[in-house]
């Protein structure tokens, strides 16, 4: 297995979270590199996209495929790229060892969403059910994989 790289992105609205998750990633001592993307790091064709004018999703997440693709291009084959949302929290636990071992055999590691997330009501959602947060085609795609 090659290098292990963690990447995250945030605009000004989530700048504190980006800094926090970068610190958490470094403190884990697992990643060879921690790459924190901001709008200034994006290629011009993404920065100039009309979608980037919207606050929602930092520009309706138009940046996400670009951030992942650009990072993949910068590293050698066999590098493990771990994309995380800047708003999540990285726990310091033994799971990281397990996940690293799994990545030696599989190209992709996905995590199952739990329907009941007690603290989500503070975000104003009337429901934490995944159907309210995810496109139907995405749900159907991953249902076929299980």
Model features per residue range: what roles?
Residues 1-146:
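Glycosyltransferase catalytic domains, chiefly GT-A lineage
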């Amino acid at each position: 297995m090659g290098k292990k790289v963690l990447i995250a992105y945030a605009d000004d609205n989530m700048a504190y979270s980006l800094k926090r998750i970068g610190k958490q990633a470094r403190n884990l001592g697992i990643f060879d590199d921690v790459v924190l993307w901001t709008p200034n790091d994006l290629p011009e064709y993404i920065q100039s996209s009309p979608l980037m004018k919207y606050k929602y999703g930092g520009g309706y997440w138009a940046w996400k495929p670009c951030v992942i693709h650009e990072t993949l291009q910068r590293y050698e084959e066999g590098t493990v790229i771990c994309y995380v949302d800047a708003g999540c929290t990285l726990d310091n636990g033994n799971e990281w060892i397990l996940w690293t071992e799994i990545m030696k055999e599989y190209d992709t590691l996905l995590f199952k969403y739990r329907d009941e997330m007690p603290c989500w009501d503070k975000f104003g959602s009337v429901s934490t059910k995944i159907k309210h947060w995810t496109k139907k085609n995405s749900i159907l795609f991953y249902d076929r994989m299980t």
